Amino acid sequence: MNPNQKIITIGSVSLTIATICFLMQIAILVTTVTLHFKQYECNSPPNNQVMLCEPTIIERNITEIVYLTNTTIEKEICPKLAEYRNWSKPQCKITGFAPFSKDNSIRLSAGGDIWVTREPYVSCDPDKCYQFALGQGTTLNNRHSNDTVHDRTPYRTLLMNELGVPFHLGTKQVCIAWSSSSCHDGKAWLHVCVTGHDENATASFIYDGRLVDSIGSWSKKILRTQESECVCINGTCTVVMTDGSASGRADTKILFIEEGKIVHISPLSGSAQHVEECSCYPRYSGVRCVCRDNWKGSNRPIVDINVKDYSIVSSYVCSGLVGDTPRKNDSSSSSHCLNPNNEEGGHGVKGWAFDDGNDVWMGRTISEKLRSGYETFKVIGGWSKPNSKLQINRQVIVDRGNRSGYSGIFSVEGKSCINRCFYVELIRGRKQETEVWWTSNSIVVFCGTSGTYGTGSWPDGADINLMPI
């Protein structure tokens, strides 16, 4: 090949390579522009629809990086929109309960600024769990903590922290409330907050951080609600509220709420005679609550709520090992599913139970008369057989010598089933402990387990003599 031919050949090859590179650059440019505009096409509405001006909850925000000849292209995957929870999975099969969380609020109050609280509970959004309580508008090491044994003052607010974080000075005050309930519908939190005069209180309904609705007292005698989580199914949340006598006939209503707006109110129906402080859980496709009869029964009332047609059915837990305090001893106590047992019916304490086929899991104070100690167990046939008393899988959560208090249920959705968990309020201070002038609490939390477990006792643990007066 002569020199001229070599020059022509080299020139041709160079021109070909240059052309290929030019085409590749054009392809890269087109791809970059296409991906840049395509990310804005996600979930765009048809031309005949209006895009609603509402906040979007982003669950995932994934960035993929693709390398092409030293050019970086970022492609953003469209975020999946949050969906309402439907709680359609089955209930987890459990053998008992395992320790989950303890906040040690009273012990920490001996040397730090921790809120004075009572009426705690736990509820979870799809990602994490939170603890709630009704604060008294003061920390424990503060003269305002004097006489905080009282339930209803205008200074009480609903506090909210991630589970396991005590209520420190930076805690969010969600609303003004001396009675409350909270739940997450899959998109946002709903808070039901009751405050005001005993004879004319107001319940505010706060959804996604905004006041959406309210309702006033209908019986003019201490409007009150669950003091534990409400339940939302497919966007409809239910909350049980009572107004009227705490030791006689009262007026209980079940409110149905969608994104903070009351859409229906159903009166209590069925055989339950007195219903307060319900502990509710999803039982697809409805909601089931186990409550407190403060008038006639030491057996606990059941309220079944149909979310679709707003119908209500009520009865009592069948187990002859009853769940309220005070109560008769186990050899003398009874329950026949339909009516209050008229045994130690006055007074009572918030508690919980849940069905497991024909059986029932339940928790209660160990003491029959006082809010001290705490135990859980399963009663064979306790959900369906009148006066059933065969107890298995008993666990001590707090030993008899230490104080307990309210307790309630909350539900956690796993990959394949819905687990039931409970918390126990560990009350300290007045009225029983007169060395101090305050009344407050810490909590301990357990969740259902299908595994094995050991034994123990998890009391509050604060030495009252080391506490601020």
Swiss-Prot record:
Region ranges (Involved in apical transport and lipid raft association):
11-33
Reactions this protein catalyses: Hydrolysis of alpha-(2->3)-, alpha-(2->6)-, alpha-(2->8)- glycosidic linkages of terminal sialic acid residues in oligosaccharides, glycoproteins, glycolipids, colominic acid and synthetic substrates
Which principal EC class is assigned to this enzyme? hydrolase
Activity regulation behaviour? Inhibited by the neuraminidase inhibitors zanamivir (Relenza) and oseltamivir (Tamiflu). These drugs interfere with the release of progeny virus from infected cells and are effective against all influenza strains. Resistance to neuraminidase inhibitors is quite rare.
Transmembrane stretches, start-end: 10-30
Cofactor requirement = Ca(2+)
Q: Give the source's domain of life in one word.
A: Viruses
Q: What protein name does the entry list?
A: Neuraminidase
Write down the species: Influenza A virus (strain A/Niigata/137/1996 H3N2)
Q: Which gene encodes it?
A: NA
